[in-house]
C-alpha cells in the first residue's frame, strides 16, 4: 500500500473519532450526562442482581441464580398450577433481604393467611385492589417510578379489565382493547423498570385458540406485547399429586423456562408445592441431589456420604426436615455443582419437549 493510501486511511479514522466525540458531547448536552456511554465503562451495568424464586432447582435452571431485577417477568399456566404461589415466594425471598414489595391484586383473590404461611411479611407488603385495568397499570407505573419498590406483582393480566368494558353492557364486544391497554402500558413501563431496578412480575392465564390444526392451541391473554417485553417467561404446570397415604397434601409441579434473555432458555425443573407450605425445599434437595450424584439412591433407599436418609422419598424428606444442618450441607454441595445440574435440566428441555404434555393436559 502506498504512503498516500495509508495517510488517507489515517485521516478517515481521525475524522471518525472526532465525529463520534462531537456526536457524544451533543447527545450529553441535549439529554444529560450518562445518556450515552460505552458499555464496559460502567462495571455495574454488567452485573445482574437477582431475587431467588424460593426454589433451588428453578434458580439453577434460570442460569443466574434467580429472577433478574430491573426486568419484566411473565409467569403463566393453567388454573391452580402454582403461579401466585411462585410469585409470593419470590416476594418472601426479597423481603428477607430487606426489599420493599407490592402486590396489585386485580383478581381480588389474595389470601393473606396463605401468603403468611409462605413467609410473606404482611406488615410490609403493599397491596392494591384496583377497579379497572387502567387504574391497576397507573398504580404500577407510579410505584415503579418511585424507585423504592424492589418487586411488584400484577395478578393477573387477564383480570386487567378496561374501563370501557366495565362501564359498557354485559354483552358488548370490544375486540383488542385489553391488548392495546397492555401494549401502551408496557411501552411506558419498560424504561422506568430498568432505571428503578424494580422487578415486575405479571401473572397470566392461558386460553385456547380456535381452529388450530397444528402445534399447541394455547395462548396467553393480553396480546403479544408482554411476550416481547418480558425478559423471562415461565410456564408452570401441575403434573401430579403428592400423597400421604390416601390424602393429597401437595402438587407435583413442572416449570419450564420458555424465554430467557439472561441465560440459555428451555430448561425445565420439577418440584413439589405442598399445601400451606409452598415449595418443598427438602424434596428439591433429594431430587437435585440424585440428579447431581450427591445423594445416592439404591433401590428405595437414599443416602448421603454413607449416611442413610430414609427408605422412600417422603421418609428422606422427613429426615432432612428434622436435620437442618445436613440439609444445609447438601444445599451447599448442590450450589457448587449448579453448572452440572443446569446442563442436565437442558437435556430434558428443548423448545418442543412439552408438546405431548401440553396436548395431554387439554
Curated annotation (Swiss-Prot):
It is found in: Cytoplasm. Signal peptide: none annotated. This is Protein RecA. Keywords: ATP-binding, Cytoplasm, DNA damage, DNA recombination, DNA repair, DNA-binding, Nucleotide-binding, SOS response. SUPFAM superfamilies: P-loop containing nucleoside triphosphate hydrolases, RecA protein, C-terminal domain. The gene is recA. InterPro entries: AAA+_ATPase (IPR003593), DNA_recomb/repair_RecA (IPR013765), DNA_recomb/repair_RecA_CS (IPR020584), P-loop_NTPase (IPR027417), RecA-like_C (IPR049261), RecA-like_N (IPR049428), RecA_ATP-bd (IPR020588), RecA_C_sf (IPR023400). ATP binds at residues 77-84.
Amino acid at each position: 500500500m502506498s504512503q498516500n493510501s495509508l495517510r488517507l486511511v489515517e485521516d478517515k479514522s481521525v475524522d471518525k473519532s472526532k465525529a463520534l466525540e462531537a456526536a457524544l458531547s451533543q447527545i450529553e448536552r441535549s439529554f444529560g450526562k450518562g445518556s450515552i456511554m460505552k458499555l464496559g465503562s460502567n462495571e455495574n451495568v454488567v452485573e445482574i442482581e437477582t431475587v431467588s424464586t424460593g426454589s433451588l432447582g428453578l434458580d439453577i435452571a434460570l442460569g443466574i441464580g434467580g429472577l433478574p431485577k430491573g426486568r419484566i417477568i411473565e409467569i403463566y399456566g393453567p388454573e391452580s398450577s402454582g403461579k401466585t404461589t411462585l410469585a409470593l415466594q419470590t416476594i418472601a425471598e426479597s423481603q428477607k433481604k430487606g426489599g420493599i414489595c407490592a402486590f396489585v391484586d386485580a383478581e381480588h383473590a389474595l389470601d393473606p393467611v396463605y401468603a403468611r404461611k409462605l413467609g410473606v411479611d404482611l406488615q410490609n407488603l403493599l397491596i392494591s385492589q384496583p377497579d379497572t385495568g387502567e387504574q391497576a397499570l397507573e398504580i404500577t407505573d407510579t410505584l415503579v417510578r418511585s424507585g423504592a419498590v424492589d418487586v411488584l406483582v400484577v395478578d393477573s393480566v387477564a383480570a386487567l379489565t378496561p374501563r370501557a368494558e366495565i362501564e359498557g353492557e354485559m354483552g358488548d364486544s370490544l375486540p383488542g382493547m385489553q391488548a392495546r391497554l397492555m401494549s401502551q402500558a408496557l411501552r411506558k413501563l419498560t424504561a422506568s423498570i430498568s432505571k428503578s431496578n424494580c422487578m415486575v412480575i405479571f401473572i397470566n392465564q392461558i386460553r385456547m385458540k380456535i381452529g388450530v390444526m397444528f402445534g399447541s392451541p394455547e395462548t396467553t391473554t393480553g396480546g403479544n406485547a408482554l411476550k416481547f417485553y418480558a425478559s423471562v417467561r415461565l410456564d408452570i404446570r401441575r403434573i401430579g399429586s403428592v400423597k400421604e397415604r390416601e390424602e393429597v397434601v401437595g402438587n407435583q409441579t413442572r416449570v419450564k423456562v420458555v424465554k430467557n434473555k439472561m441465560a440459555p432458555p428451555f430448561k425445565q425443573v420439577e418440584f413439589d408445592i405442598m399445601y400451606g407450605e409452598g415449595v418443598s425445599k427438602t424434596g428439591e434437595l433429594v431430587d437435585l441431589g440424585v440428579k447431581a450424584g450427591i445423594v445416592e439412591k439404591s433401590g428405595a433407599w437414599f443416602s448421603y456420604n454413607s449416611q442413610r436418609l430414609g427408605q422412600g422419598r417422603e421418609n428422606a424428606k422427613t429426615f432432612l426436615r428434622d436435620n437442618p444442618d445436613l440439609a444445609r450441607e447438601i444445599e451447599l454441595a448442590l450450589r457448587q455443582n449448579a453448572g452440572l445440574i443446569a446442563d442436565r435440566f437442558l437435556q430434558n428441555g428443548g423448545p418442543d419437549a412439552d408438546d405431548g404434555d401440553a396436548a395431554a393436559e387439554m
